[in-house]
Swiss-Prot record:
This is Carbamoyl phosphate synthase small chain. It is an enzyme of class 6 (ligase). Small subunit of the glutamine-dependent carbamoyl phosphate synthetase (CPSase). CPSase catalyzes the formation of carbamoyl phosphate from the ammonia moiety of glutamine, carbonate, and phosphate donated by ATP, constituting the first step of 2 biosynthetic pathways, one leading to arginine and/or urea and the other to pyrimidine nucleotides. The small subunit (glutamine amidotransferase) binds and cleaves glutamine to supply the large subunit with the substrate ammonia. L-glutamine binds at S44, G240, G242, L269, Q272, N310, Y313. It comes from the Bacteria. The gene is carA. NCBIfam families: CPSaseIIsmall (TIGR01368), PRK12838.1 (NF009475). The keyword Ligase applies. Composed of two chains; the small (or glutamine) chain promotes the hydrolysis of glutamine to ammonia, which is used by the large (or ammonia) chain to synthesize carbamoyl phosphate. Tetramer of heterodimers (alpha,beta)4. InterPro entries: Anth_synth/Amidotransfase, CarbamoylP_synth_ssu, CarbamoylP_synth_ssu_N, CarbP_synth_ssu_N_sf, Class_I_gatase-like, CPSase_GATase1, GATASE. It comes from Helicobacter pylori (strain J99 / ATCC 700824).
Length: 375
């Protein structure tokens, strides 16, 4: 059994199918119908519980080759967990996978009702425990727990040292991963790692870019010198967890990189940090965008793209003073992409690499290559 307590006073008890223990985090909902493993292993969900709108979970098991990272969300909530998986590539059940990663698995919850609660109240802090079941004690622990905006989440998911990305890329012909080809000429880019998904790095690799992954706290001078020496051709700012406004030191360094006119590309948190660094602070959405079925309009082509999304924060409309808005969300008309006028920078709020989700926005990686070739 697992007991849940939300900051709005809701107390629930359900079945446990994951790890044992107690976790505190922010509760968000995800509307993806598949790809639960990629969601669970996405560093952007660090410090969060994910409730899936898809009522069934576990039917394809789990395969560690498909992980986005070594990091995980705090826990997952589903209407029904299916222990009997069917997938030729799976090597364990989802339950076994969650236990290995220390992730709580919670089933038997009325997820429809819970998601409606989140839509009404917004994202809520929550505590879940397989150990403590007293409502008052859970309430007390949650009351004294730090808010997610005050937690140093990025530092817990960023690389501690500079490394080269050489992860193999999935081959749909063989249904396995093919090795990185060192013989192919690659432009080298620096990746500021705020919690990068593995498939973002794979897609950068697939368009001919070799990624050197730098810690989130890397000084701007180090990257500027590398660019001036032609050791790198540009900089990519990754996705990541938490409130972008909590990263004040990193924002100061990004401001220096912008002033140096280095070609840059940001996704999700990276997109937000580029905005804040130029004086346009983000604001928090009521319940965020989480899922792989969000329509986004490309304002330059008028095409509508179905995208993968995972964020709680958004850049403000005032960004139009220094940037051309290239994409908008068709659910709420929020900004999804910009091209800056004052520097060679593009950024998007959604995830063009998908994983999970459609790849209708994959062309953005090629746009970044074109940006690099222009400098």
């Amino acid at each position: 059994m697992v007991s849940l307590y939300l900051e709005n006073g809701l107390f629930l008890q359900a079945q446990s199918f994951g790890a044992s223990g107690t976790q505190v985090g922010e509760l968000v909902f995800n509307t993806s119908m598949s790809g639960y493993q990629e969601v669970i292993s996405d560093p952007s969900y660090k410090g969060q519980f994910v409730v899936f709108s898809m009522p069934e979970i576990g039917v394809v098991g789990a395969n560690p080759k498909d992980d986005e990272s070594f990091f995980s969300c705090a826990g997952v909530l589903a209407r029904h967990y299916n222990e009997f998986f069917s997938n030729s590539r799976a090597d364990s059940s989802l339950s076994t996978y969650l236990k290995k990663r220390g992730v709580l698995g919670i089933s038997g919850v009325d997820t429809r009702s819970l998601i409606k609660t989140l839509r009404h109240h917004g994202c809520l802090m929550m505590i879940a425990s397989t150990i403590e079941h007293d409502r008052n004690k859970l309430e007390e622990v949650l009351k004294n727990a730090p808010k997610i905006s005050h937690s140093p989440l990025v530092s817990s998911v960023s690389t501690p040292k500079i490394i080269t990305h050489q992860r193999a890329t999935f081959d749909f012909n063989t249904l396995d991963y093919k090795p990185f080809d060192e013989k192919i000429p690659h432009k080298i880019i620096a990746v500021l790692d705020f919690g990068a998904k593995g498939n973002i790095l794979n897609e950068l690799q697939n368009v001919g870019l070799k990624a050197l992954i730098y810690p989130h706290h890397t000084k701007a001078n180090e990257l500027i010198k590398a660019y001036e020496k032609k050791e790198i051709s540009g900089i990519f700012l990754s996705n990541g967890p938490g409130d972008p406004l909590s990263l004040q030191q990193e924002i100061g360094e990004i401001k220096r990189l912008i002033n140096a006119k280095i070609p840059m590309f940001g996704i999700c948190l990276g997109h937000q940090l580029l905005s804040i660094a130029q004086g346009y602070p983000t604001y928090k959405l009521k319940f965020g965008h989480h899922g792989s079925n969000h329509p986004v309009k490309n304002l330059e082509t008028n095409a509508v793209e179905i995208t993968a999304q995972n964020h709680n924060y958004c850049v403000p409309e005032e960004i139009e003073e220094i940037a051309t808005i290239t994409h908008r969300n068709l659910f709420d008309n929020t900004i999804e992409g910009v091209r800056y006028k004052n520097a060679p920078i593009i950024s998007v709020q959604h995830h063009p690499e998908s994983s999970p989700g459609p790849k209708e926005s994959h062309y953005i990686f090629k746009e970044f290559v074109g940006l690099l070739e222009g400098f």
